[in-house]
UniProtKB/Swiss-Prot annotation:
This is CTP synthase. Residues 599-627 are annotated as: Disordered. The active site is at C399 (for gatase activity), H526 (for gatase activity), E528 (for gatase activity). Its EC number is 6.3.4.2.
Amino acid sequence: MKYILVTGGVISGVGKGVIASSFGTLLKSCGLDVTSIKIDPYINIDAGTFSPYEHGEVYVLDDGAEVDLDLGNYERFLDVTLHRDNNITTGKIYKLVIEKERTGEYLGKTVQVVPHITDAIQEWVERVAQTPVQGSSKPQVCIVELGGTIGDIEGMPFVEAFRQFQFRVKRENFCLAHVSLVPLPKATGEPKTKPTQSSVRELRGCGLSPDLIVCRSEKPIGLEVKEKISNFCHVGPDQVICIHDLNSIYHVPLLMEQNGVIEYLNERLQLNIDMSKRTKCLQQWRDLARRTETVRREVCIAVVGKYTKFTDSYASVVKALQHAALAVNRKLELVFIESCLLEEETLHSEPSKYHKEWQKLCDSHGILVPGGFGSRGMEGKIRACQWARENQKPLLGICLGLQAAVIEFARNKLGLKDANTTEIDPNTANALVIDMPEHHTGQLGGTMRLGKRITVFSDGPSVIRQLYGNPKSVQERHRHRYEVNPKYVHLLEEQGMRFVGTDVDKTRMEIIELSGHPYFVATQYHPEYLSRPLKPSPPFLGLILASVDRLNQYIQRGCRLSPRQLSDASSDEEDSVVGLAGATKSLSSLKIPITPTNGISKSCNGSISTSDSEGACGGVDPTNGHK
């Protein structure tokens, strides 16, 4: 087993996750099986109770683990399935050691950070490194990312553990890559290497010497700066890798390859890579990177959320939208709308913000209402669902988005004006959304319906089922504590809301569709967690297709995208969507009202453009493996 440890210096958020994932992508392109471990030096057991504003999105794995969003990067980059033990926290390690002490495994010894905590860390890494993450084959390389920066007091036990670990596994099996910031002050206009020198000096003071120094910078770094870092940090020039800010993170593995990373790792770790038998993985990366640069036509999607001030709160949602947009040859234009600003209260308190946010919503080509918790902004989500339903605007609701759509429908189609969720109003007379008793234990951490579960499709035609490839059931990841009240299902269906997916017991509603609407779909599960660049999530793909008036064409072709067209850059002069040529019927024949009551133009002014997305070494599968 080979190990690559990725550490960071100077500042956090310097890009260790992308660098670590890129190492894995390069090695996987050489035919090696790769796994990843993320170490978070906080005392929390997991990320389940984190505020989205503080830590970003909580990513959910197949086994129900709530983990750091970097594990989502690993899964998307490498197209693997990770497990709860692939995320190590200080809380998990201390809990493990304390439990061993309580059962007498330390035979009455004084339990200390060294050796007990450090030994537990090393044993955990060795055990998880042997766990298969793709098929049944054991990984050959394990990439470990240590969160935070060198010098943080929280991370010192882990640094000491890896100081010992390098001797435990021998030098030829251990490589350390240190990611450091090279700032470019405007006052001087030249890169400064002192922060990197200090960071490497501190790392060496802990007993670890970097084999590779990855320099992150705003602009490309000149050869003289690279040589200076080489001289003062005691590494060869070929061991200094310069990664500047790029238009797309698709380019990061390619830039690392150009810097000779594969050749260095092959020699340093004795990987015995046959360079003449490289797989087509990196060629797929090059194709994807080229397409992100050449696609010009835009699709504008409004994300009506509660945590829009910090876009990492919706990291997987954004990536899933990017994957779907790229699949249909569109550049994604994202507009983040704070849901509370759509509420009537804002009209009276801040009318300018109210009208501005509603203008953004009306100008978009499609709407996405993501998940969330709590009462703040819920009425804004409900109003967004109402506008999309009444104005034939394509909409995808996720988790809380489904619940908002159901409540809105009950209020305005069933006449139940007090319809609500017990999360917000426990005493409501018409509880359309209720909590699940078995998941309501009084605690918050780890008490939700989590992980991959089966959703069974109902009989009869369904747009979302066709998008998945017409299977009888699919498996998707969940994270929720509330569900649609089954007592109201028949009343909702009588008015045109179709529950086309349920759990295996047919008691929990998983998917809704609206009859006579271009695309009004909502899911209780989170489809964004299983989206991949070459395998876009079907619900997201449906939203993008409907937003560009191509959904009917896609369905007529049997919901298939051409592998060649997915991998090759397409001309923006083409009027057809990638993989959809030959279809005859378009949603443009529908009379869709696009002008709201307050008269808004059909542009995406004031929106946020984004085109970064991950790549994977997998094949093309329009059903995204949901079989």
